[in-house]
């Protein structure tokens, strides 16, 4: 990213920063202005990379949980996932704080010579900040997708457990009640009498542990969503602003191109008009000469 933004501001070969300062009224080199800014951007992107790594760990743990049939195993996975989600919350808050600082820094930077609103430096900073915020929003969306997946897969697992124990598929009301309360012993009363209490109680304990895990994980993921909400609003607003700027630039470019085309056509018409005027004058002169010759008839005088 550093190369992408700083290459546009490199001095011409053979030139010196001092000469540039004199020509620009002792303004700072734009590439120097961006160096500190890009370090802050890199720090935020490093945090986003950590969020991505934690997201993958949570997705893997969620896949593992589908095959678990023991309460203690489910509890161990839950503890791992809770630890990772807590870490996600910590990193997300850090990232949000750094983005807020970046935006404040962008505003204060506009007070520097040559860095005012709309300048090349200002546009680069704004666009880069917007891109970083967009990445954070995308990661936020990924965590919410994970939350929905955990909830749906929990429902699927509960249905399978009831079917495995009872031999019949539960209706939606039964599944909803299990998801809401986690209490399944009453549903398995007949199976307990037929298969024995010990074996069924393992399934009951696993369903209860899974219920508690999903409830706690969902609560933590909802807390994450709140952390990102303000940022999402800012990203959308800045996205609209950047789109408007791009639209205005595109419209201005189109108008300029139309103007150039019209000017070229006018020059072409003017050139053609002059050419035909010359032809008309020559033709008129020829006609005049013919008339004069016809009137004077110099060949008769000679005779």
Curated annotation (Swiss-Prot):
**Mode of membrane association:** Single-pass type IV membrane protein
Q: Which Pfam families match?
A: SNARE, Syntaxin
GO molecular-function terms, A-Z? SNAP receptor activity; SNARE binding
* Localization, UniProt: Cell membrane
* Consequence of gene disruption: Dwarf phenotype and shriveled infertile grains.
Per the record, what ranges lie on the membrane's Vesicular side?
297-303
Q: Which residues lie on this side of the membrane: Cytoplasmic?
A: 1-275
Residues crossing the lipid bilayer are 276-296
What are the alphabetically sorted keywords of the record? Cell membrane, Growth regulation, Membrane, Protein transport, Transmembrane, Transmembrane helix, Transport
Which GO terms are recorded in the biological process aspect for this UniProt protein?
Answer: exocytosis; intracellular protein transport; vesicle docking; vesicle fusion
> Which parts of the sequence are annotated with region: Disordered?
1-28, 107-132
Kindly list the GO CC terms recorded for this protein.
endomembrane system; plasma membrane; SNARE complex
Q: In which tissues is it expressed?
A: Expressed in roots, stems, leaf blades, leaf sheaths and panicles.
Reading the lineage from the top rank, the first entry is Eukaryota
Q: Which part of the chain is the t-SNARE coiled-coil homology domain?
A: 204-266
- The UniProt record lists the keyword Cell membrane: yes
Q: What does this protein do?
A: Vesicle trafficking protein that functions in the secretory pathway. Required for plant growth and seed development.
Spell out the PANTHER family in the cross-references. PROTEIN SSO1-RELATED, SYNTAXIN
What is the name of the protein in this document? Answer: Syntaxin-132
């Amino acid at each position: 990213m550093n190369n992408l933004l700083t290459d546009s501001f490199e001095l011409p070969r053979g030139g010196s920063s001092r000469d540039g300062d004199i020509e620009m009224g002792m303004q700072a080199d734009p590439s120097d202005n961006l160096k500190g800014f890009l370090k802050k951007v890199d720090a935020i992107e490093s945090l986003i990379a950590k969020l991505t790594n934690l997201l993958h760990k949570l997705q893997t743990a969620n896949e593992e949980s589908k095959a678990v049939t023991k309460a203690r195993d489910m509890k161990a996975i839950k503890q791992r996932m809770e630890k990772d989600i807590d870490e996600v919350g910590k990193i997300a808050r850090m990232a949000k704080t750094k983005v807020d600082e970046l935006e404040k820094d962008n505003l204060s930077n506009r007070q520097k010579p040559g860095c005012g609103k709309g300048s090349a430096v200002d546009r680069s900073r704004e666009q880069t900040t917007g891109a970083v915020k967009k990445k954070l929003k995308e990661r936020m969306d990924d965590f919410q997708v994970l939350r929905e997946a955990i909830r749906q897969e929990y429902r699927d697992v509960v249905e399978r457990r009831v079917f495995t124990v009872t031999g019949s598929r539960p209706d939606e009301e039964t599944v909803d009640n299990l998801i809401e309360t986690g209490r399944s012993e009453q549903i398995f009363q007949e199976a307990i009498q037929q298969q024995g209490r010990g074996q069924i109680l393992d399934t009951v304990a696993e369903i209860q542990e899974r219920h508690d895990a999903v409830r706690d994980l969902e609560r933590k993921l909802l807390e994450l969503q709140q952390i990102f909400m303000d940022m999402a609003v800012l990203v959308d607003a800045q996205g609209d602003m950047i789109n408007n700027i791009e639209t205005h630039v595109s419209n201005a470019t189109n108008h300029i191109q139309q103007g150039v085309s019209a000017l070229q056509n006018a020059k072409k018409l003017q050139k053609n008009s002059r050419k035909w005027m010359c032809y008309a004058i020559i033709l008129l002169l020829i006609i005049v000469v013919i008339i004069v010759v016809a009137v004077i008839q110099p060949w008769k005088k000679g005779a």
